[in-house]
Amino acid sequence: MIGGIDMKRVEDIVKIVSPTKVEGPVTAVVSHITADSRTVQEGSLFICLVGATVDAHTFVDKAVEDGAVAIIASKPIAVPDHVAVLYVEDTRQALQDAVPFFYDYPASKMRMIGVTGTNGKTTTTHIIAHLLRSQGYTVGVIGTVHILIDDQSYPIHNTTPDVADLQQILQQMVDAGVTHCIMEVSSHALALGRTAGVEYDTAVFTNLTQDHLDFHKTFDNYLAAKAKLFKQVSASYQVKEGKGAVINVDDAYGQAIVEVTTAPMITYSTEGKGTMNASNLSVTAKSSELTLNYGEASYTIQTKIAGLFNVYNTLAAVGACVYEGLTMDDIVKGLRTFTAVPGRFELIEEGQDFAVVVDYAHTPDGLENILQTAKKIVENRILVVFGCGGDRDATKRPIMGRIAAQYGDRVFVTSDNPRTEDPVQIVKDVEVGVKEGLRDGVDYDVIVDRREAIFAAIAEAKAGDVVIIAGKGHEDYQILKEETIHFDDREVAREALKER
């Protein structure tokens, strides 16, 4: 055993990846597996991936120097005699096959719940985790905010980690006694095969709106990536019971997901279209109440989270927990004690007579959702501070500008994470849409410095206003061209409130 997993030798990996050629000894023990040359250690199996800009075959010498006992490659390489080389046609496929095997397929030892969609994944996963935890289960969460193993939180860099990292995390969860793992499953992860070796028991679809077209190129590709999760659950349902899908049929693309799903499903709606429906909605700045109709019964649901979008997130979580065996009475009781996820419609309170909300909304639909919620609860004006990220789908910039101007009474266009792009050009792209959407009496400012923009909006706010600071939510950094700096919208908002 190595760290809770069965010992593997190079010859065991050979059986899994079926190489076209093997050179060198195959009896060495593999104690670690990676596709990142920076993490190679004594006993590692190093897999040479060929990316868009980097070819890992160029790092073989360093990997051997750092202790690699075997290399998986698709191109001829020269290594010392004591290092094994497994030649394959597709190293990425080899990675997807070898890593889950190395970790003894940890996902098969837990209930796996996958949540996919453009918006709502984080809140939905956290509601599911809260409800399961309230019934005594030991829970793991993998998502945008963090990795959570029982009550321990760890930082994360991708919504869904790469194959090697994901399998290692899942093994840590198994070692910690986790019974249920709830994952945000991004379209990137599904398209790139990052979830290889993971068989989901419950799949949840929240919604599909414009995002990530810089990666997927077309909306059809984006939809197809999301649909993979439901095809997989449907296929595995043929051989294993206890599978289910939970699908938002109010979303324009929900029906497309329904059509590819042959596993049992719960469809949810606020318009009476689903097998689980919400009615009698009442939303305030800090809470929501609704009637949930499922089967022959109706239940009064009370939560401490606001917004129609959170009603949908709640329905998604309820559906998932039904498949996980929770009773409706337990679900209703558990929902009363759930509080907002960091950076998701998070109220910043410093005793002021107006509301300040920090939210992760970084898509057109996400921004419109929070502004619609603000419209329902505001007594006076809506002030919007937002920007768009660099090196990402540029077509959504004017769309988001138009939405901000249509709903906001005062708009502050600023930077988000400009990355390698010129922040001035990004705000100009956004400004095009702002000008198109401006209503009579609405004004806007362009303040490239995000800190200054937040301070300006809060300084201008009056009693009864709502200040929406959108785009970064829980993030505590800002990615600039030359560096990544510490930056937290919530901290800056508190500073601005204290200086008023």
What kind of feature is each model-predicted range?
Residues 51-53, 77, 187-188, 210-211, ...:
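Short glycine-rich anion-binding loops that position phosphate/pyrophosphate groups of nucleotides
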Residues 14, 95-245, 253-261, 377-378:
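Phosphate-binding loop of NTP-binding sites
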